[in-house]
Amino acid sequence: MPRDFPRTRRVGEQIQRELAELIRDELRDPRLGMVTVSEVTVSRDLAHAKVFVTALGGSDEDNAKTVEVLTRAAGYLRKLLGQRLRIRQVPALHFQHDTAFDRGDRLSRLIDEAVEEDRQQHDDDKPDNG
């Protein structure tokens, strides 16, 4: 696992906040719905930033389209970030779909199913008093 450096983490957090605002307020692409910027990891030399995004309520196709739209707008977003951030060089933005939400949703459904099966099993094991 790569070592975490305080400066890269701070820059990543600031880029995350600013990008979320810029995507919401500045991008006017009709293909872009509600987008969550869930994490930004910045390389040690601050040259590259991986931006993890999810289209809210979106399918895999919607998420792929969102990543494509944001990738095409990366230069514009980088320019806007340069106007807001106080760093010498704004990292190149690399957008990726964040699968953590999907995995969390899947785990939640599996847990719900297991609880329901356990409840049914428990109800079947009860003796009939009547």
Swiss-Prot record:
Gene: rbfA
Gene Ontology CC: one annotated term: cytosol
Record-linked InterPro entries: KH_dom-like_a/b, RbfA, RbfA_dom_sf, Ribosome-bd_factorA_CS
Superkingdom of origin: Bacteria
One MF term in the entry's GO annotations: ribosomal small subunit binding
GO biological process: maturation of SSU-rRNA
Annotated compartments: Cytoplasm
Keyword Signal: no
Gene source species: Alkalilimnicola ehrlichii (strain ATCC BAA-1101 / DSM 17681 / MLHE-1)
Function according to Swiss-Prot or TrEMBL: One of several proteins that assist in the late maturation steps of the functional core of the 30S ribosomal subunit. Associates with free 30S ribosomal subunits (but not with 30S subunits that are part of 70S ribosomes or polysomes). Required for efficient processing of 16S rRNA. May interact with the 5'-terminal helix region of 16S rRNA.
Similarity remark: Belongs to the RbfA family.
Name of the protein in its database record: Ribosome-binding factor A
UniProt entry keywords in alphabetical sequence: Cytoplasm, Ribosome biogenesis
Oligomer status and interactors: Monomer. Binds 30S ribosomal subunits, but not 50S ribosomal subunits or 70S ribosomes.
Family annotation (Pfam families): RBFA
